[in-house]
A protein has these predicted regions:
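Long, non-globular low-complexity/IDR segments in eukaryotic proteins
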Residues: 1-32, 42, 119-123
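Beta-loop motif signature
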Residues: 31-32, 38-91, 101
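Boundary regions of SH3-family modules and the immediately adjacent low-complexity/disordered segments
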Residues: 23, 28-33, 55, 84-123
Length: 123
């Protein structure tokens, strides 16, 4: 009988751990958006702060997939618009700066930066 209780307790512990990590990963999940609409021969700049005058961290061409943190200027949260059609999502961020998680040096040193939403589409 003791083995039954130990097995049940172990199964519940594993299940609760899996559920905790599942919920946690959903809360911290990044949304993938793609760079698009940048003029030929140009790139989308990632800035340290949400401003054209801010320090440039990196630049990405059309087709690059960026990982968004979900936070945009104007109080916009990408998780709140995630269920809408792509055109409505794009329209919502068109004039906003959105935060990305990227690796400008491509050495595993990920940092946050800001990109202008006009050049992003949901991926």
């Amino acid at each position: 009988m003791m083995n039954f209780y130990v097995s049940t307790a172990a199964a519940l512990a594993v299940a609760s751990t899996v559920l905790a990590f599942t919920g946690q990963s959903h809360a911290t999940a990044f949304a993938a958006w793609q760079v698009a609409g940048v003029p030929f021969g140009d790139t989308l700049n990632v800035r340290k702060y949400p401003s054209n005058a801010s320090q440039k961290q990196a630049a990405y061409p059309n087709g690059t997939i960026l990982q968004m943190t979900g936070k945009c200027t104007g109080g916009l949260n990408l998780l709140e618009i995630a269920g809408k059609p792509n055109w409505k999502q794009k329209q919502a961020i068109r004039y906003q700066w959105c935060q990305v998680w990227h690796d400008p040096a491509q050495n595993g040193g990920f940092v946050t930066g800001w990109v202008y939403g006009k050049y992003l589409v949901p991926y």
